[in-house]
From Swiss-Prot:
Modified residues (Phosphoarginine): R115, R169
Keywords from the named record: Phosphoprotein
Protein modification: Phosphorylated on Arg residues by McsB.
Conditions for induction: Is repressed by the transcriptional regulator CtsR. Forms part of an operon with ctsR, mcsB and clpC.
Domain UVR: 139-174
Protein name: Protein-arginine kinase activator protein
Any GO BP: stress response to cadmium ion
Protein encoded by which gene: mcsA
Function: Activates the phosphorylation activity of the protein-arginine kinase McsB. Is required for the delocalization of competence proteins from the cell poles.
PROSITE patterns recorded: UVR
Disruption phenotype: Cells lacking this gene show a defect in the delocalization of competence proteins.
InterPro entries: UVR_dom, UVR_dom_sf, YacH
Keyword DNA-binding: no
MF terms in GO: cadmium ion binding; cobalt ion binding; copper ion binding; zinc ion binding
Amino acid sequence: MICQECHERPATFHFTKVVNGEKIEVHICEQCAKENSDSYGISANQGFSIHNLLSGLLNMDSSFQNAGTQMFSHSEQISACPKCGMTFQQFRKIGRFGCSECYKTFHSNITPILRKVHSGNTVHAGKIPKRIGGNLHVRRQIDMLKKELESLIHQEEFENAAHVRDQIRLLEQSLKSTDSEEEQE
């Protein structure tokens, strides 16, 4: 996508503005964003890069850093990725891994970061197409309720757990009935 201001460089900033109830999308390059920083709400003296974002996440705050000393000490035991040779310290510096094996090698180090960034989720769920995903929505809901049930039992909230268990049973019954209907067709 090309910058809407200069029509020369690739757009790296994408804004959505709502003006008088009308949604307007603006796509501009970094240079035009700096030049027109006031109109886009960007501070001209404060640069932004993905590196700064990831560095900020890796060095979140003092409580995270204190917890991170134990977390990062494990990465020093694993000196480098066996495939590409990248160390976790290098990842912290440049903000990106060298290969897919790095994710496996440094999994225990990046899990807290991912959990913080993705609101507690560390597993990609993806989207389900509406046309063909009817049963998948129900199965996902059952999986979420089962996790909630385990949590409630662990917290000894047995009355709430019984309600969740009943919801799971109802959803499983509806799933069985839709599966049997599809088999008959």
